[in-house]
Design a protein with these regions (language model features):
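Conserved glycine-rich cofactor-binding loop
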Residues: 7, 14-16, 38
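The beta1-alpha1 cofactor-binding region of Rossmann-like NAD(H)/NADP(H)-dependent oxidoreductases
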Residues: 39, 62-73, 105
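Active-site loop immediately N-terminal to the catalytic Tyr-X3-Lys motif
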Residues: 98-101, 148-154, 176-177, 212
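Substrate-binding pocket helix/loop in short-chain dehydrogenase/reductase
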Residues: 99-100, 104-112, 194, 202-205
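Active-site helix of classical SDR
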Residues: 123, 159, 167
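Alpha-helical segment proximal to the catalytic Tyr-Lys
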Residues: 128, 172-176
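Residue(s) in the substrate-gating loop at a strand-loop-helix junction
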Residues: 143
Length: 214
């Protein structure tokens, strides 16, 4: 098991890519904290994961990723329980498909606060401990639309472009301190979040996929 006894926090871990990541990490022997938007969602995810991995060590937390104080408080609980934090997966994110001419400041802030500020808050909460241990991994979930853009909902690709820049900068700064910082950029993926995206937005994206499917 490649991650045996490693301690990982996965934001947005209650569904979609985050839940699949938690499942994979547990299968590889990691101890996992699933961070979700609510205590109810976190507990539901933990219950599902324990049904798959009865002997696994997995807990749920529900930080407000827009608040550093909330994130630090919840992450400290994980560190207190497991002794350290080895891996942070910044996966939580929100997307929408509002045309630019209908965008409001509140729409923009909602996306940026979670997708960009949330990455800062979560990473800032763990990095001191990782530096002290001269070891750690930060993995950010970006998106292919950070490169290609998309025809509606401009704030999502803009936020993921910011994640790319954050990843590169932190990799340069933290690498000499023993911390690896990387990003993955999935294409359009069939998750719960995509159910809210209209067909007229999804279909042109699917047309660009060689297999013509999600």
């Amino acid at each position: 098991m490649r991650l045996k006894d490693k301690v990982a926090i996965i934001t947005g871990g209650s569904r979609g890519i985050g839940f699949a990541t938690a499942d994979a990490f547990l299968r590889e022997g990691a101890k996992v904290a699933v961070a979700a938007s609510s205590e109810k969602n976190a507990e539901a995810a933990v219950e599902k994961l324990k049904a798959i991995h009865p002997d696994a060590e997995v807990v749920g937390i529900s930080p407000n990723l827009g608040s550093f104080e909330s994130v630090k408080e919840e992450f400290d609980k994980v560190e207190k329980q497991f002794g350290r934090i080895d891996i942070l997966v910044n996966n939580a994110g929100v997307s929408e498909s509002t045309p630019f001419t209908s965008y409001t400041e509140a729409d923009f802030d909602r996306v940026i606060d979670l997708n960009v500020k949330g990455v800062f808050n979560a990473t800032r909460a763990v990095v001191d401990g990782m530096i002290k241990n001269h070891s750690g991994v930060v993995l950010n979930t970006s998106s292919m639309v950070s490169i290609s853009g998309q025809p509606s909902g401009f704030a999502y690709p803009a936020s993921k472009f910011a994640v790319n820049g954050t990843t590169i900068s932190l990799a340069r700064e933290l690498g000499p301190k023993g911390i690896r910082v990387n990003a993955v950029a999935p294409g359009i993926t069939e998750t719960d979040m995509m159910k809210a995206v209209p067909k007229n937005v999804i279909e042109p994206m699917i047309a660009q996929i060689p297999l013509r499917r999600l």
